[in-house]
């Protein structure tokens, strides 16, 4: 359904994610200078990016490649490009139907535009309850478990110790409210993203001569053109399905989480934040997920083969160790943990 909506929104907006792609970057970079009672567009962008970027970019990509083969990465790209239009629409709606709270911050999101736009308070409350349950309990457990397993495999730290540390770090930030969360993500997200991308680029440059083979495997696997590149279950459907599923899990376009952060921004026009949040989908999947995928595929059959039995998070660690030895364990763990 989310892929179908992405196609509909792409057609309806005449490919806004392609037509205004350069303008998105200009708006995002320029928004760092904003001042206002609510959050700046850049702060709202980093809050959204902190939610998107995390274990989905590591464990999610790894699982997509294990189950769907190299071609799954191609379908993650397609889903992300379509998802940019979905993200644009949901974030723009969040701005249109937002309300000003007593704390001076703007509040909005799907629950608000379901109530105020569709006139259904009941469905708005139901959506809000489901969102709180999903993002308050389920998704944090997935993220935290991946982090705990990484620390356990790299340093032998018990899972329960990592859990306590994560709680101790998170509580002061959350108790400070949205402004404190935004202040932290505004500085932390760019730094950690740059570190991850730099290490990824170093890995790619070390294996630059093998990059054509990686792209060949991705495109051949995406369309079932070569035997041995399909994942568990085999066939083109397994590749497409797993790529799309993991792509949506990673970039969260259309899931209803991003608009809540988008609504908090002070912008001159609702479309401005829609464009900026749309860029987050691109950064998450086309850039960060691709880096993880390239590092795994560049490691070759000694580390990765489609359909292999290996924990998804461990695959990324094994690939990084293959390229950069023990540095990779520290890098992967430390760059993932802050996003939780």
Predicted regions and their residues:
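Conserved small/polar residues in nucleotide/adenosyl-binding loops
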Residues: 330-336
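Membrane-interface helix-loop-helix modules in multi-pass membrane proteins
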Residues: 44-106, 116-120, 274-301
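Helix-loop junctions at the membrane interface of multi-pass solute transporters
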Residues: 9-10, 52, 62-68, 94-100, ...
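Membrane-embedded helical hairpins/re-entrant loop segments and their flanking transmembrane helices
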Residues: 14-46, 223-253, 259-275, 279-282
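Transmembrane-helix boundary/entry motifs in multi-pass membrane transporters
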Residues: 27-49, 80, 91, 95-135, ...
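Extracellular/periplasmic helix-exit of transmembrane alpha-helices
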Residues: 89-98, 199-217, 228-231, 264-265, ...
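Membrane-interface loop-to-helix entry segments
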Residues: 5-25, 145-151, 158-219
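N-terminal alpha-helical transmembrane segments of multi-pass membrane transport
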Residues: 1-55, 65-72, 83
